[in-house]
């Protein structure tokens, strides 16, 4: 559903709802609550590279943050059925993200891009990296030869990804980002001034003390908890894998325009 040029805020909100990037999203309520419960129970796979300790051991506290920052239904008795992402909250977060990208461009910062959802978000990150490079930023090149238990840490179109069996791999793990930052320090190279990512890539960078911003779905609460605690600077709520990656193009155009990078 292409939108010619850069959409207005109202046009973008409408587009997000029509494509189910926000609004009535594909992730059902029971899946959201299951993930909130697993995080609260200390299942580290759902911590997305972060260290949450026992601060979020109450599932209802997690739900409250997700209602505030994402727009899911705030009723703890609502257990099954349709859940939502508030498109106004999505655009609000895009505006905050645009402000951080604008600062990166003004200061000619070193920026690292990464994604654990290459099927949906790779081109969002690629386009943002290209715009920042054109504005004078250094896009961090990751060290060669990195791997985790899941696969090899590679870089395509300026975006770090996990490769497994000649396939770009979906991962929520923070280990690929750990591998990158550890290797940069080992080589005596400076860490990024900013990481733009999602899932565990964003989570681990924030945990490591690097300015980190990113994207997260309604069933991935850890990054929103980290944003509420100040560990991550901005997290944009959205469905991270809709029917076509082209559906994200108007969102990216809006983001880059608001950041002064279009």
Where does each model-flagged region fall?
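Gly/Ser/Thr-rich loops at beta-strand to alpha-helix junctions
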Residues: 114-125, 198-203, 219-221
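Short, acidic/small-residue loops that bind anionic groups at enzyme active sites
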Residues: 134-145, 210-225
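C-terminal functional extensions of proteins
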Residues: 213-262
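Glycine-rich phosphate-binding loop
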Residues: 180-210, 214-216
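Metallocofactor- and cofactor-centric catalytic cores in central/energy metabolism, strongly enriched
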Residues: 2-116, 143-145
């Amino acid at each position: 559903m292409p939108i010619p040029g850069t959409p207005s805020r109202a046009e973008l909100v409408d587009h997000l709802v029509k494509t189910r990037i926000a609004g009535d999203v594909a992730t059902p309520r029971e899946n959201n609550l299951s993930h909130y419960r697993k995080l609260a129970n200390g299942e580290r796979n759902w911590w997305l590279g972060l260290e949450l300790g026992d601060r979020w051991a109450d599932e209802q506290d997690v739900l409250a943050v997700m209602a505030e920052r994402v727009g899911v239904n705030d009723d703890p008795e609502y257990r099954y059925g349709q859940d939502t992402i508030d498109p106004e909250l999505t655009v609000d977060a895009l505006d905050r993200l645009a402000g951080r990208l604008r600062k990166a461009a003004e200061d000619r910062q070193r920026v690292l891009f990464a994604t654990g959802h290459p099927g949906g978000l790779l081109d969002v990150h690629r386009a943002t990296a290209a715009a920042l490079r054109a504005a004078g930023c250094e896009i961090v090149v990751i060290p060669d030869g990195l791997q985790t238990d899941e696969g090899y840490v590679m870089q395509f179109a300026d975006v770090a990804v996990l490769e497994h069996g000649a396939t770009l791999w979906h991962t929520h793990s923070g280990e690929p980002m750990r591998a990158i930052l550890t290797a940069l320090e080992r080589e005596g190279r400076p860490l990024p001034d900013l990481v733009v990512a999602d899932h565990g890539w964003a989570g681990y960078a924030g945990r490591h003390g690097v300015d980190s911003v990113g994207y997260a779905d309604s069933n991935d609460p850890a990054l929103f908890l980290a944003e509420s605690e100040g560990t991550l600077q901005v997290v944009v709520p959205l469905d991270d894998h809709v029917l076509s990656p082209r559906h994200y193009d108007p969102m990216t155009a809006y983001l880059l325009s608001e950041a002064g990078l279009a």
